[in-house]
Amino acid sequence: MNGTLIRHALLVAIAVAWAAGAQAQQTRATPILSKDLPDFAGKEVTISTVEYPAGVASAPHRHDAHTFVYVLEGSVVMQVTGAEPVTLSPGQTFYENPTDVHATSKNASATAPARILVFMIKDKGMRATRPAN
């Protein structure tokens, strides 16, 4: 009886630790600036950084924006639907147009974090990211 109880408690502890680790391993966006563009009715610019822990990838998504990416540190793999994936290093850039589906967005390294700067021109008040579907 005690052995079964201990095994169950151990399994629950492992499951909780795994779930906490999985939650911690996500990209993290930090907004830097959001500014209306008065010369472009209904448009705004947003600038943010996105951090990718080692080995982390985001699910396919859309931005519905002109999206410019600049790699600050580490290496990332980016791909829009219909194009080949590209691996980018610090100082390199990537562009998505408003109709693109961002099929791949991941840290190229399983051991080191990566960080990018993202500059978007989008419809004012619209979410920066939404699921691809």
Model-derived regions: residue spans:
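Ligand-binding loop in jelly-roll beta-barrel domains
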Residues: P85, D100-G125
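Extracytoplasmic
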Residues: G42-I47, H66, A83, T99, ...
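N-terminal targeting signals for Sec/Tat export/insertion, comprising classic cleavable signal peptides
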Residues: L33-A65
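A short, N-terminal "cap"/entry segment at the start of jelly-roll beta-barrel domains
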Residues: N2-T46, Q79, F94-Y95, P113, ...
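Glycine- and acidic-residue-biased ligand/ion/polar-headgroup-sensing regions
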Residues: A65-G82, P90-Q92
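Short beta-strand His + acidic residue motifs that chelate non-heme Fe in jelly-roll/DSBH
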Residues: P60, M78-Q79, E96, H102-S109
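Short acidic-glycine-tyrosine-enriched beta hairpin
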Residues: L37-A41, Y52-P53, G82-T99
